Regions:
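C-terminal, non-catalytic macromolecule-binding modules
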Residues: 118, 138, 142-181, 187
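Aromatic/hydrophobic pocket-lining residues that form the small-molecule binding cavity
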Residues: 4, 40, 108, 140-143, ...
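Conserved SAM/SAH cofactor-binding pocket of Class I
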Residues: 2, 6-16
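Active-site proximal loops enriched in glycine and acidic residues that flank catalytic Cys/His/Asp
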Residues: 23, 60-62, 88-90, 126-130, ...
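Conserved, mostly hydrophobic/aromatic
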Residues: 4, 21, 58, 86, ...
Length: 266
């Protein structure tokens, strides 16, 4: 923990405004160390004590390794953004077991309920794989129904890619490229509609924005490179925070008062 905190202090001292905590499974942090303080909740509490004006964003958490303590730590942290990045991959129990995800539909639903109840105004980002070997039409329909119901603020869809050396490579029931593409498109179309609804709900809000460049920033609900943007007037200084009034939206982005989307971004 101390080494991570020291690195964070150095970065913040050099003007960094957002600290990203990321690994293959960030929720597993510290479990392979002898230091009992080396847990993600303890790290978040330590970062709360670091001086400066900055955000902390936790990326790539695993649904099987969350704890009540982590939910509480994220809710109580004055530095951590209210943003949960948790790739679920699927919701069908059979597919989850073949993926070795160590979780079930019931556990996922319970965890999401706990996160949303425990962290007010949280945005949840997830990712799903369409066309995994053995994904029947019924299993895909179950995934689609779950996406419709859960209404994730941020969501990515990936078509299964056959990779030699993986367990799934030799599994029976591989889905054709045509069907995988069709399922990918259907899921993306559904999420695009949901995302547009989420963004419209932000109109009228006054939100804190981190400006990555003049006129281009992000809310706490947007990770760099993968989520939406806030478009401002172009007078904002890169690497600063300000509060912006949201006056418009697109499917994935927000438009602040006096802002406009650059032509090259259409």
């Amino acid at each position: 923990v101390d080494s991570v905190l020291k690195e964070a202090e150095n970065l913040i001292g050099n003007g960094v405004k957002e600290i990203l905590l990321i690994s293959q499974d960030t929720t597993y942090y510290g479990r392979d160390l002898s230091d009992e303080r080396a847990t993600l909740p303890e790290l978040l509490r330590g970062l709360d004590k670091v001086g400066g004006d900055f955000w902390v964003r936790v990326l790539y958490t695993h649904p099987a390794h969350w704890s009540d303590e982590l939910v509480e730590a994220l809710a109580e942290s004055k530095r951590a953004v209210k943003y949960v990045d948790m790739p679920l991959q699927h919701i069908d129990d059979w597919v989850l077991s073949k993926m070795r995800r160590e979780t079930t539909e019931k556990k996922i639903r319970e965890l999401l309920k706990k996160i949303r109840a425990g962290i007010p105004s949280v945005a949840v980002r997830t990712a799903f794989i369409a066309g995994f070997p053995g994904e029947t039409p019924a299993r895909f329909d179950r995934l689609m129904a779950f996406i419709e119901e859960a209404k994730f603020e941020r969501l990515g869809i990936f078509s299964y890619s056959k990779e030699e050396g993986t367990q799934a490579y030799s599994m029976p029931g591989h889905v054709s490229a045509r069907v995988k593409q069709s399922r990918f498109e259907r899921a993306m179309e559904l999420q695009q509609r949901i995302a547009a609804e989420v963004q419209r709900s932000r109109i009228g809000m006054r939100l804190r924005v981190l400006w990555d460049a003049p006129g281009v920033g992000r809310t706490e609900w947007d990770a760099p490179g993968v989520d939406g943007r806030v478009y401002g007037r172009g007078l904002e200084k890169a690497g600063t925070f300000s509060v912006a009034t949201i006056e418009g939206s697109t499917d994935y982005d927000l438009i602040a008062k006096g802002g406009a989307i650059p032509k090259e971004d259409f």
